[in-house]
């Protein structure tokens, strides 16, 4: 998935954006991992791994 496609996908899920001087923070709608911290970290790690593999493949 191209970075702009990933960004557009996240924009659709965004419920709040906080703008700072040179960056912004997007709050994304929560899913089933919201109530389970272990599951949240597993999903977060999976997301980071997928992003790293995509960058490496390019």
From Swiss-Prot:
**Looking at the record's lineage, which domain of life comes first?**
Bacteria
Protein name per UniProt: SPbeta prophage-derived uncharacterized protein YotN
The source organism is Bacillus subtilis (strain 168)
Query: What gene is it encoded by?
Result: yotN
């Amino acid at each position: 998935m191209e970075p702009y496609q990933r960004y557009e996908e996240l924009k659709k899920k965004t419920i709040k954006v906080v703008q700072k001087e040179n960056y912004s923070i997007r709050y994304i709608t929560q899913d089933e991992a919201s109530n389970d911290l272990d599951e949240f970290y597993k999903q977060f790690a999976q997301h980071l791994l997928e992003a790293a593999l995509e960058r490496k493949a390019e």
